[in-house]
UniProtKB/Swiss-Prot annotation:
Subcellular location: Cytoplasm
Active site: 59
Superkingdom as given in the UniProt entry: Bacteria
GO biological process, one term: protein modification process
Protein name as it appears in the record: Protein-L-isoaspartate O-methyltransferase
NCBIfam families, alphabetized: pimt (TIGR00080), PRK00312.1 (NF001453)
One annotated Gene Ontology cellular component of this protein: cytoplasm
Predominant localisation class: cytoplasm
EC number per UniProt: 2.1.1.77
Gene field: pcm
Catalytic activity: [protein]-L-isoaspartate + S-adenosyl-L-methionine = [protein]-L-isoaspartate alpha-methyl ester + S-adenosyl-L-homocysteine
Length: 208
């Protein structure tokens, strides 16, 4: 049953234009039901965002795949994730690169994600309880930064923690949100709008 559900999801993602085989394989291999409340496990392989507690959600699989694809990762990419949440996006990234750095402002979510990743034998992740707006300077600079909550504006600290030719993928806006990809070239930053999205807000400075 799990195989058929993950295969249906794989087929859906391909229909939506996801082409990166490594990303598709990572999503096929990961048991998404482990990252959500047990009562919602019947929805694990549907293309839905689902609540995970603390007012937060796990993103729909299409958005996870799309944002990951936009990062243009290589196995040696130095990656920062802002918003660990359930740990699902973290786990997808960990299947693709040698090491992932992930920040979460809500301590209980960070702790639960860290424990779950270990249970799934995913050890190439460093997690931190902290303010994602500030990034993680000591681990940078980064080839890729992915933000899993919507910022009112683009945090400058994240921009300047990108390497030259580094990619930042971030939802921006309040009521209406756009998924942006920003690429650093020297001291300049080039932005493109990918699509309309809906995310929980990225809260600055306030740890929980």
């Amino acid at each position: 049953m799990l195989n058929s559900r993950s295969e249906l999801l794989d087929q859906f993602l391909r229909q939506q234009g996801i082409r990166n085989e490594a990303i598709l394989a990572a999503i096929r291999e990961l048991p998404r039901e482990r990252f959500i409340p047990e009562a919602l496990s019947h929805q694990a392989y549907q293309n839905n965002a689902l609540p995970i507690g603390e007012g937060q959600t796990i993103s729909q699989p299409y958005i996870v795949a799309k944002m990951t694809e936009l990062l243009e990762l290589t196995p040696t990419s130095n990656v920062l994730e802002v918003g660990t949440g359930s740990g699902y996006q973290t786990a997808v990234l960990a299947k693709l690169v040698e090491h992932v750095n992930s920040i979460e402002r809500i301590k209980s979510l960070q702790w639960n994600a860290k424990r779950l990743l270990k249970q799934l034998d995913i050890y190439n992740v460093s997690t931190k309880h902290g303010d994602g707006w500030k990034g993680w300077e000591s681990k940078g600079p980064f080839d890729a930064i992915i933000v899993t909550a919507a910022a009112e504006s683009i945090p400058n600290d994240l921009l300047f923690q990108l390497k030259d030719n580094g990619h930042l993928v971030i939802p921006v806006g309040e009521e209406s949100q756009q998924l942006l990809r920003i690429i650093r070239q020297g001291e300049e930053f080039f932005s493109e709008v990918i699509e309309e999205v809906r995310f929980v807000p990225l809260v600055a400075g306030e740890l929980a």
